[in-house]
Amino acid sequence: MPSQFFGLNTAYKGLLASNAALNTTSNNISNVQTKGYSRQQVVQQASDALRVFQTYGCAGAGVDTIAIERVRNEFYDTKYWGANTNMGEYSIKQYYMQQLETYFSDDGKTTGFKTIFDQFSVTGLQAVLKAASDKTTKAQFIGYAGNLTEYFRSMVGNLEKVQKDANQELKLKVDEINSLAGEIASLNKQINVIELTGSKANELRDRRTVLLDQLSNIVDIQTQEIPITDANNPDRETGAYRFLVRIGGG
């Protein structure tokens, strides 16, 4: 038969579980505006019942708080990273295509290749063919040829500038990738230190996910989390994980 304090202990465990749930709810509300924060929930399970050898069988022993976990679906993270990679790629392409479009523009406000070439091949050349001995016509044709030459010279300079800008941005992106990779590696170590004790490093995992969001906007990524097992007992998981990030399908 359980002691007289058994019911009090059951109630006490219920209060502890409710307090954990209340604190978790407060934390969720406080972080509503926090970038990358994942809502957390308390995982509870019924305590092992006590055998009392009575007709009603076992006496319930209350509730145990198992863990506080993130409410997050890795499937949607993977889908988001794929879409984010595409968006980053197309944004860069759009930017440089707009640069090229500006240089090749011929819309009436900006004199472009079509206008200059038409002046040279249609207006100037046809005039020379009709009046080959006219010095004014020849001079005008030479002027159109000079404009076309200057256009190509200017276009070469503009395209070289675009290429230089693209190379510079590529270097900056490589530096950014290396920086993000270093931060992710550092967080992995911190997460393992905490989770080896059986706790959940929810906030650190959120920070790592934010970094992965940023990384996926630059390059295609795939992630894999592999449990680390005890070297002396391969069937026993230590609680730590080896977190792998593959970049560009590597």
Task: Identify what each model region corresponds to.
Residues 19, 184, 188, 208-209:
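Interfacial residues of coiled-coil/leucine-zipper alpha-helices
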Residues 118, 142, 178, 202-210:
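An alpha-helix initiation/capping motif
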Residues 194-201, 205-212, 217-218, 227:
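Aromatic-residue-lined binding/catalytic grooves and analogous aromatic/hydrophobic interfacial grooves
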Residues 1-123, 127-141, 146, 153-154, ...:
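Bacterial Type III/flagellar export signals at protein N-termini
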Residues 145-192:
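Long, non-coiled-coil amphipathic alpha-helical linker/lever segments
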Residues 14, 112, 176, 200, ...:
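Conserved acidic
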